[in-house]
Amino acid sequence: MFSTRRLKKKSQSVDIAASGYNPLSDASAPQASRVPPPIVKAISEEEHHNTTNAQKRHLRRGDLKRGYTIDTGQKKTLEKKDGRRMSFQRPKGTMEYTVETRDSLNSIALKFDTTPNELVQLNKLFSRAVVPGQLLYVPDPDYISSVESSPSLSPISPLSPTSSEAEFEKSTDTERMPYKEITSSPAYSAIRPSRVVSSTSEEEEAFTEKFLKINCKYITDGKGTVNGVLLVTPNNIMFDPHKNDLLVQEKGCEEYGIMCPMEEVTSAAMYKEIVNSKLKDSVSVDVGQLSCMREFCHLKKISPGNLHDIDSQMWDAGNDSASTAPRSTEESLSEDVFTESELSPIREEHLSSDELRQDKSSGASSESVQTINQNITECSLNISDCVSASDDVKDSLEPSGNDSGIVASINDLEKSEASINAGEGVDKDISESSLILTEAIEGHNSNDGILSSNKDKQTGDQNHSREAAFVRNHQHETVQEEAVKQSFGDSETEAEELRKFWKDLTMQQAKQQREDMQHTTQKEIMGKMPTAETHIEGVCSSVAKEKRRHRSHRYLCLRVGKPMRKTFVSQASASMQQYAQRDKLEYWFAVPHERSDHLYSFFIQWSPELYAEEVRESAREPGFVVVKKNEETEGSDCSTNDSAARLWEVVSVAEYHRRIDALNTEELRTLCRRLKITTREDVNSKQATNIKNDQEPESFRPNLSDPSSLLQTDQIEKLTKHLPPRTIGYPWTLVYSTAKHGMSLKTLYRTMLGLDTPVLLVIKDSDAQIFGALASEPFKISDCFYGTGETFLFTFCPDFEVFKWTGDNMFFIKGDMDSLAFGGGGGEFALWLDGDLYHGRSHTCKTFGNCILSKKEDFIVQDIEIWAFE
């Protein structure tokens, strides 16, 4: 019994604890009507609710802490796999690119017209190695960057949830926490600022300043002007043409891609205009094209749909003269997007101003209707509703600038007409007020002067009478209906006439306004698009003129010791073209005005440094020295016009010393001429000139193994002056002649076997004209062109002339079983012979830049001689 009682007490205690009983109420447990105290239960529920909220609040704080902190190390496995990609969002003006199998960082940079260093900076790469399948951010060619932001310097978001979600969670937690908790724990009241991953560090900024990337134009000599990018680094200067340029698409990028080491640059000068007479006469550069290109493309990207929005916005802003000042055209065009919150106040004020204008500028008929309404003392509710509906119709017929407003106004008019004609109680109310209106009209006709003199008083009485009629209509509606039936049973005809009068008046005004609106809107719609296009073109032209005024171009002249190398050809071809253009030591570029100072600072700061000539001298001299205008005299290389047009010039140390020596030498020579002093150098130079003139005929007269039947002695001497240096001193050996070997190309190839020297081809045609070619290698059968830049063409028709390699291409010599050809390009050969060595043809070509060698384009071969040098 004792154990059973203890068991019951234990179970009872559990139930009591579970149900929230007070232990003091155990004695009264058998009573069924007794209920636990509600205060204890409410307290327990509140504690349970607070516990649950605290758990949720701590959970949300933990989530926010994990989302806004990237240094705690509590990242998930997925975040670790793609942690670097999640560390920043895609910068503005970039697009994603997946690395392919054969891609490298240099090839990707070349494909998207950028530099490898910029790709490293955009993607936060630790090395230049890329793997297939890797995602990279590359510049978007269709993106138009603004002045405020650029793709490389766009801010990067931290590794955190979206800002809207974070703010929502923070505000929710703050509202749920008690005020004491907020004040006592500031760590939880506000979210800790997260560590934002910056887009560029100080080291990267310093690194990016070590090169200049300038959009400019390369002005060539006789090959046009192309747009491209000039890349200036401390070690090299490189120009890459734009692939979208018309000349590049026509002739290829091989013609315009150039590069040279910085140590080869002897002088870099900036000019206001081109001082080279050849380039100045043949090339005209559009100085405003680069400066206004971005603004022009930005205006051109406005779609026709946006034109409609812009015009409507300009309409609203122009009509709202009472509330806002009119904006200029350029300012209205610069605001591409208007939010609804910005436009809604303008539209509301516009409607209010329209209502004011309507009240002030109503017609005579509307004034008469208003005068009649002022004299009405007792009017029904339906009549007042109809009058308000008609006023709404008039308001809705105000100009809105589009067709949808007209259609809506017509629909509102039809609805208002239907509301006038509908309702069972309308006829009763009209019949009730018809007599009052008739009396008012008669009183108006008889008391016109009184009404006009007491206009202000009647206006005040009008408001009072309308309010009284409104209250009286609600209170005594039934009484008025019975009175109308008893007293005015014969007034239905007058009410019908009044209704027709009101309807005709309203319809006439609505029709008049609708016709005016349709006519005006049609004109606006027909002239909107041409006007908008003309407006944009005008704005663009004004912008272009303004940019030309403030952003004129400057011309950069680079003088080098060796010709620049082609970058889009093989190394062997580049070396050969560099040899062919060995006389071209000057290159011109049209750069924007604001980049002139950048180039000047770059050459001074980041130019390669050269050691001094003295071995023991530890000090270094800068790579370039600034040349001042007062250091130049008449004996310098620059003329007076050159000095006037030049803004600044930096020269290498070697060039600076050379100019100083030349200046000193010229001053010394001037002094000697003034004092009539003859130096030893002048005497030796005069004697050497006399000796050279005496020995010149003998030195250029080679020994021939056989007498030539085609060349005279003076012609041989002229040809000898243009032969390659490795042929001088060797006798001329006749290896083939049509008089000895016959006229056969196969025989000619057979006689060339075993030779390893240049050969001279001399042709005489049926017109007795002498011309030919010097081949750097013996003639042979080949699948493609062969030879070197030593090859040239010559003619004695009518005078002696030599055409050497221009460097445009390497189509020197081509031999097969049926023909022998020299030069090429454009589908024509400079010199062509058939397999029988009987027919020939000569034409201009790009390889040698020659004219037609013979008197006629097609000729007949009379005799051929081939001489070797061995």
UniProtKB/Swiss-Prot annotation:
Residues 709-870 form the TLDc domain. GO terms for cellular component: mitochondrion. Residues 61-85, 167-177, 345-360, 454-464, 473-484 have a biased composition (Basic and acidic residues). CDD domains: LysM (cd00118). Residues 149-165 have a biased composition (Low complexity). It is found in: Mitochondrion. Residues 209-267 form the GRAM domain. Residues 45-90, 149-177, 313-369, 445-464, 473-492, 686-708 are annotated as: Disordered. Keywords: Mitochondrion, Stress response. Residues 95-138 form the LysM domain. InterPro entries: LysM_dom (IPR018392), LysM_dom_sf (IPR036779), TLDc_dom (IPR006571). May be involved in protection from oxidative damage. Belongs to the OXR1 family. PANTHER family: NUCLEOLAR PROTEIN 7/ESTROGEN RECEPTOR COACTIVATOR-RELATED, OXIDATION RESISTANCE PROTEIN 1. This is Oxidation resistance protein 1.
